[in-house]
C-alpha cells in the first residue's frame, strides 16, 4: 500500500449549509485513525457563504480535503453522484454538510469492523438527531443491532446517512 493511499473517503455534499458546514468538517478532521483518509466535499453552488467556508478549510488542509465546487446548482442526487464518484478510498463514509460526527474514533471503529469481517459491505450505528426547531434530541433507537440485507435496508430506510461506512465499488 503506498503512503498516499486513503483507506477512507468521506463523502460530504453541501448546499447552503453555512451555519453547519464548519462543524461538519471539524467532525471529520478530528478523526483519530491509524490510516489515511480524505474528505471529498461536493459544494453545489450555494448562495450563502458555504463555499467560502469550504475553500478556507481546503486551503488549510490540502492533503486531506478535495473540494469539488459546482458552477451551477446540480441538485442533491447529481451532486451526490459526482462527489461519490470522486471518492477513491477502499471505503466511503457519508456525512452531509448539515450533519456532524461527535466520536473521534468513529472511522477507526467502523473500518476495524469491516477489515475483520470481510463478508460485510457496510456498517452503521445509531445517531442522535438534533433539530433546532424541536426542544428535545431524538435518539435513533429504531436502528436495531443485527445484520440487514439490501432489501431490508432499501425498504425500511434503517440507515442514518451520517453513520454509514461502506465498501467502495461493491458489485450488486
Q: Language-model segments: what does each one mean?
A:
Residues 1-172:
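Nucleotide-sugar donor-binding/catalytic module of glycosyltransferases
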Amino acid at each position: 500500500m503506498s503512503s498516499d493511499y486513503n483507506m477512507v473517503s468521506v463523502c460530504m455534499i453541501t448546499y447552503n449549509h453555512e451555519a453547519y458546514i464548519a462543524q461538519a468538517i471539524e467532525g471529520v478532521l478530528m478523526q483519530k485513525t491509524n490510516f489515511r483518509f480524505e474528505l471529498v466535499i461536493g459544494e453545489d453552488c450555494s448562495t450563502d457563504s458555504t463555499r467560502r467556508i469550504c475553500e478556507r478549510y481546503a486551503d488549510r488542509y490540502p492533503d486531506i480535503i478535495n473540494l469539488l465546487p459546482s458552477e451551477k446548482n446540480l441538485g442533491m442526487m447529481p451532486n451526490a453522484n459526482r462527489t461519490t464518484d470522486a471518492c477513491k478510498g477502499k471505503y466511503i463514509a457519508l456525512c452531509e454538510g448539515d450533519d456532524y460526527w461527535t466520536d473521534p474514533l468513529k472511522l477507526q471503529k467502523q473500518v476495524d469492523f469491516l477489515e475483520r469481517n470481510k463478508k460485510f459491505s457496510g456498517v452503521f450505528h445509531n445517531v442522535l438527531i438534533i433539530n433546532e426547531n424541536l426542544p428535545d434530541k431524538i435518539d435513533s433507537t429504531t436502528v436495531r443491532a443485527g445484520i440487514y440485507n439490501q432489501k431490508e435496508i432499501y425498504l425500511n430506510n434503517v440507515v442514518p446517512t451520517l453513520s454509514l461506512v461502506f465498501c467502495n465499488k461493491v458489485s450488486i
